[in-house]
Amino acid sequence: MLSAKSLFQEILDNDESFRLFCSIAASGEAQGGWENGRIAALVPESERDLAPKVARHGADEDKHGRIFNALLKKRGLEPVEVPHETDYTMLLEKHGIGLAHEQLKRDQPLTVQDIVTYLAHSRVTEQRASEQMELLRKHFSDHPDIGRAVRMISSDEDNHLAYCHEELLRFARAGHGRTIQRILRESALAEIRIYRDVSLAVMDHMGRILGWPRAKAALLAAGIHAVYVYERLGGWRRMVSLKMPERRNALGGPATSAPEFA
């Protein structure tokens, strides 16, 4: 039976597919870490209290990148170049979701509008990350090789999502509510399309590595398209709702270390 668990187990059991999976994940996390590090450095003076939380957000993502690279090293594997069509983070930036890298490379302070854009973009992408890690935690939290990494990253992603909810609600109370809802909607509708395209590309690469028969590849592609249809018809709304999280001030302290993955 084809299931999320059996699919990931197949990827996990093969060195080349595991190598590609970890390389894609590490690259995306490292890119997110750089983006958040730059945002933290450029936070406007009126929002300087937010800078340590943005920095913590970036530090967590840097840590996740190191964890995925450490998982490769543990199996004696080297990272591979990430195929362009599988680079989720880069494709989001290319399609104008979040803050442009050219803007972040400059030393010009961001505006409050920029910070709202960053938080709204993160609200959408962290929803996806939290859901994906929850799925892995459900099936692989006790796995001897990746279980600890899965639990740690999953907890961090839940913290990131809680942080986005709390800060966006703060900005909404300050009068930015309509702007937040507009950016959330635009980001969510773009994200579900990019997620579909990246998922199809990743499965195509995995299928060639693992020698999947055409029927299996077609079934997986049909499943990805079905998820997109569901999300386009209304599933995207889960990515734009805001509620006060149970985890308050989720990024209020320093990033947790992962010395065992150093």
Identify what each model region corresponds to:
Residues M1-A262:
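Non-heme di-metal
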